[in-house]
Amino acid sequence: DQPADVSVGGIVVLRLRHAGQRLQTAQQRATLAFNVLQNELMFAINQKASYDPKRIQVAKRLDNVVILAGGQTVCVITDEDAKGNRSSAFELAQRWAENIRKGILQNVADADSGLT
């Protein structure tokens, strides 16, 4: 199973891997993450300068590290994700969350200046 990239407005923000035995493929995970991030991006563009990038959060749910966008789960960081990025799950989630924030803010700035 090949890794699957997830973009926010054309900016790649994370790369998901297969979630393990009998779980979702990388592409299935990427599709779910993309849908949540599209909704967050539309919300951010509507909010413009008042958008709070702190809506993108890293949290612990049960024994998992997750990334949230406006309270919605973007993705669960799997062992495969962490190993593939030579990182701990928490460090990887922090990095991806920052990528998502930057991607959203860049798209908001572009939309505000008429570049999109």
Name every feature range the model reports, one short phrase each:
Residues 1-116:
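N-terminal targeting peptides and non-cytosolic leader segments immediately upstream
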